[in-house]
A protein has these predicted regions:
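SH3-family beta-barrel domains
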Residues: 1-18, 78-81
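Short alpha-helix capping/helix-loop boundary micro-motifs
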Residues: 1-2, 23-27, 38
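C-terminal structural segments of small proteins and small subunits
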Residues: 11, 51-81
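Short, structured beta-strand/loop micro-motifs enriched in basic residues and often containing a Trp
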Residues: 11-24, 35, 73
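Short, charged beta-turn/beta-strand-edge "cap" motif at the junction between a beta-strand
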Residues: 20-21, 43-48, 59
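Short, Lys/Arg- and Gly-enriched loop/turn segments at beta-strand edges
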Residues: 26, 46-53
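Conserved beta-strand/loop element in small beta-rich adapter and peptidoglycan-binding domains
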Residues: 34-42
Length: 81
């Protein structure tokens, strides 16, 4: 089931499926976030912003508004801390 990256909980894994707009796509593509890539939620700040992720072997922080524009398909296997 597709959902926004911002909806995932810490430790969850998902595959990036699409982005809502081209502006965010170019920025994220430069950081290794491309459709088909597996992404893991590492940490969510107490107020929900920013969200720390791991993608393509890199640790990145995304603002909540960026995470809301990324659509993912959650995987069955998740790594819990």
């Amino acid at each position: 089931m597709k959902k926004r990256l911002s909806e995932l909980k810490v430790g969850k894994l998902a595959v990036i499926t699409e982005f809502e707009n081209d502006d965010i796509f170019l920025k994220l593509m430069e950081m290794g976030c491309i459709p088909g890539e597996t992404i893991k939620i590492d940490q969510i700040a107490p107020l929900g912003d920013p969200i720390s992720i791991t993608v393509a072997g890199y640790h990145l922080s995304l603002r909540l508004d960026e995470a809301e524009k990324i659509w993912v398909e959650e995987t069955i296997i998740s790594k819990q801390h």
